[in-house]
């Protein structure tokens, strides 16, 4: 929750993703963000549809035809994203308020009328597990690819200079408070049933459904499923907008935004048709490849004005890239580089693959 918002704040303070990337190499921005945009088209955006339909729509309508609703999902996303200037405004005025109100009602109900008593923790290394679990969500990656669209939306409202910085930090703080309330409420509700369920006895999705059903009955389930769909849809719209905007700039206008904003939903519809499990199994390792790089750049960005030269940026990012390249085959189950990886300090105890193996 905190890292994506921190990344947006840092990128805004530095000016843009490109400005912070230029400390590494003038071409690094195009290469890295271009690769993340491809990952976004092949993984992140299709996954929003798969999650929204499988966990949202099919949660209340198990027989819902998957492919039909994938197509409908991306048609709706296209209709919101087709106008670059108003895409985020429409999301902020229509979809996000509905989703936020529903989630607030659910967590307030769960906090006011708890369904049990919080028990002892049943997961070892909860913080590290949760932190590295962010790899598979790719939230910081989304911050890097959507930051430009977010900043452009603020500047279109005539915020410049110091006014822009204040507006963007204010927006991030409001988002942080809202997310803290929602996630804090869900964490408390989860703790209240910790004596009834163990991590091995139920999946995360079914656990969430069980908690919400116990708290508010079937009506609460409808609310949860609707909020899941809306959360996924808002994410898809912002990412489609970001991808189309980036490649219009990267191709120097040879591919227009209007053309790209139609191509992206078509590509993502095809990928999403394979289903959530296939998407995750084939592409999750790429999140663990890019996530450390963007995380290092976020940390460096915090101290940008204190770092005397670009050498620190180059050294930190290049060594992180080397580590990510070495770790990628391991994420796919190939162990031929394990002897090298095992000599990297802290690789074993805190690696994403290591912790994931202990969860299964």
Kindly give the residue locations of the regions a language model identified.
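Membrane-water interface regions at transmembrane-helix termini and the short interhelical loops
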Residues: 15-19, 74-95, 156-157, 269-281, ...
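Hydrophobic, membrane-embedded alpha-helices of multi-pass small-molecule transporters
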Residues: 37-41, 107-114, 123-189, 220-235, ...
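Inter-helical loop and helix-membrane interface segments of multi-pass membrane transporters/permeases
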Residues: 45-69, 113-135, 328-348
């Amino acid at each position: 929750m905190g890292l994506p918002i921190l990344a947006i704040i840092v990128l805004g303070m530095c000016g843009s993703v490109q400005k912070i990337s230029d400390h590494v190499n003038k071409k690094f921005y195009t290469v890295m963000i271009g690769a993340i945009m491809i990952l976004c088209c092949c993984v992140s955006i299709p996954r929003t549809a798969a999650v929204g339909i499988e966990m949202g729509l099919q949660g209340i309508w198990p027989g819902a035809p998957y492919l039909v609703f994938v197509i409908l999902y991306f048609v709706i996303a296209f209709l919101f994203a087709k106008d670059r200037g108003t895409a985020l405004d429409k999301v902020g005025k229509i979809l996000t308020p509905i989703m936020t109100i529903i989630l607030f009602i659910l967590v307030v109900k769960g906090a006011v009328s708890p369904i049990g008593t919080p028990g002892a923790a049943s997961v070892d290394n909860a913080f590290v597990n949760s932190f590295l679990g962010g790899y598979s969500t790719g939230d910081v990656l989304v911050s890097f690819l959507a930051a430009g669209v977010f900043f452009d939306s603020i500047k279109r409202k005539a915020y410049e200079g110091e006014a822009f910085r204040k507006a963007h930090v204010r927006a991030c703080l409001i988002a942080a408070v809202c997310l803290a309330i929602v996630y804090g409420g869900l964490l408390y509700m989860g703790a209240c049933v910790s004596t009834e369920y163990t991590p091995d006895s139920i999946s995360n999705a079914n656990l969430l459904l069980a908690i919400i059903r116990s708290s508010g009955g079937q009506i609460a389930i409808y609310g949860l499923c609707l909020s899941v769909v809306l959360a996924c849809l808002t994410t898809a719209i912002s990412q489609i907008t970001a991808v189309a905007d980036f490649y219009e700039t990267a191709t120097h206008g040879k591919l227009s935004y209007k053309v790209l904003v139609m191509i992206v939903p078509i590509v993502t519809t095809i990928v999403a048709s394979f289903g959530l499990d296939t998407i995750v199994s084939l592409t999750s390792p790429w999140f663990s490849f890019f996530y450390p790089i963007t995380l290092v750049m976020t940390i460096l960005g915090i101290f940008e004005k204190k770092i005397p030269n670009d050498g620190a940026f180059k050294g930190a990012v290049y060594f992180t890239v080397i580590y990510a390249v070495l770790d990628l085959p391991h994420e796919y189950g190939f162990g031929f580089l394990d002897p090298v990886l095992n000599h990297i300090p802290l690789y074993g105890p805190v690696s994403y693959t290591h912790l994931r193996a202990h969860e299964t």
